[in-house]
Regions:
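Bacterial N-terminal signal peptides
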Residues: 9-20
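Short, low-complexity interaction segments enriched in Ser/Thr/Pro/Gly
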Residues: 5, 24-26
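Bacterial N-terminal signal peptides that target proteins for export
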Residues: 1-11
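Extracytoplasmic metal-acquisition and chelation regions
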Residues: 26-182
């Protein structure tokens, strides 16, 4: 039995080596950071299991005047894509984004027709909460899908399918409301 200690050492070394090696199937997920939770929810529906989606802000946070932390900057710097709303919703974002290098950003409100604000200090300006319109929400989904497909082409088919399913779910949810209003 003199070989038993050597066998145990060999097995232990082999097991430790196997644990430290990263197999091809354990590839890290594509990392997406959004400026707030609504976009994170939409992006998660489009990404499914193909990407890891997180929001800079937490639920209930004041999105307009948010004060990013150093941890927010660090997390965003580790992303492979940042999704923002635009339309002057995230007043803090331009300065925040200057602290990042090499992380692409896509404004998911591109192409929407925002309603105008008709009173108060923002009278005449576009309402930045454009996702609240069903038609605009579908544009957001398309923009998120296109961004994910562009920056993570290996999972393009997944993003395409998930976006199609998510849009159908949105339309199905809204169909009874449209029927009542028409």
């Amino acid at each position: 039995m003199p070989h038993l200690p050597h066998l145990k050492s060999f097995l232990l070394a082999s097991a430790l080596t196997a644990l430290t090696l990263s197999p091809a199937w354990a590839k890290e997920k594509f990392k997406v950071v959004t400026t707030f939770t609504v976009i994170a929810d939409m992006a998660s529906n489009v990404a499914g299991d193909a990407a890891e989606v997180s929001s800079i802000t937490k639920p209930g946070a004041e999105i307009h005047e948010y004060q990013p932390t150093p941890g927010d900057i660090k997390r965003a710097q580790g992303a492979q894509l940042i999704l923002s709303n635009g339309l002057n919703l995230e007043l803090w974002f331009a300065r925040f984004y200057q602290n990042l290098s090499g992380v692409p950003e896509v404004m998911v409100s591109n192409g929407v027709q925002p309603m105008g604000i008709s009173e108060g200090p923002y009278n005449g300006k576009p309402n930045p909460h454009a996702w609240m319109s069903a038609e605009n929400a579908l544009i957001y989904v398309d923009n998120i899908r296109d961004a994910l497909m562009k920056y993570d082409p290996d999972n393009a088919a997944t993003y395409q399918k998930n976006a199609q399913n998510y849009k159908a779910k949105i339309q199905q949810t809204l169909a009874p409301l449209h029927a009542e209003l028409v």
